[in-house]
Amino acid sequence: METPTEKPIVLPDLIKVIYESHQQDHPLVNNVAWWQLHLENVNGHMEDEEQWPALQKNLKKTFNTWQRNWKKWAINSLDTLLGKVLNLPAHISAMSLSYEIFSSVINVWTSCVSTEEVDETDCSDFLKKETTSTSSTIALTPIGVAGTSGLVKSSPSELFRKLANPSNISGSLNEPTGMMSSSISLYENGESVQYTLEEKVGKYRVTMNVYDGPESLKKEKWYQAPIARITMSVNNKSTKLAVDQMLAVLTEDFMKRKPTRQGNSLTYGKRQKRY
């Protein structure tokens, strides 16, 4: 795999390497849905990468633009794809990437391609779903929050079925504006459903991953057994209360197990004194 090291790495370099790495075994690299679906898969493994939110946002904008101009762009090769990407606004086409995030995305993308198959049916279903999303609205049964209308009673399986219902597709293909990219992904029996949006950061910025413990032991990588992945802004009082209560319950439960204290450490933003 050729990687650009002599010059600044930009977003099109990332697309180029991913395309070249998979074009032989995955002809769907010319299908925008292949990129959209794998971007969703990759997103769940990149929470700890500082530059990822901005990169994910610009990749999403790139693929959304491609999707809206599917017939006009007529992508059938790497050259035609790069030609279109390079004509996008400079904050996207010239976005500079560190070598660390560049390498990390390529490695995670390759891992997701090998473990989470995306075929023509998946791509077709995705494009059909996105086509109808501009006129559909979400209609989920309200979920009770502790402290307001009782404890949450929905199981992960029930949530999956609610979100996976075709009538629950919402949003539009218009470019949103905001301060953070939020998403929720639920998984069941090898299937996944995801919703995304752009929103302002609220009182809390929550990222939570839930994995199936027994299933994770059967997988080559433990993170291949997800139940849910959530990244979202929390500003609503009842939702914030639910987060506070969850933290309290989890902390209390964990401390009952008599963990070993590791000592204090520096938090983000504080500098270590030099003597």
Swiss-Prot record:
Name of the protein this chain belongs to:
Non-structural protein NS2
InterPro entries given in the database record? Non-structural_NS2
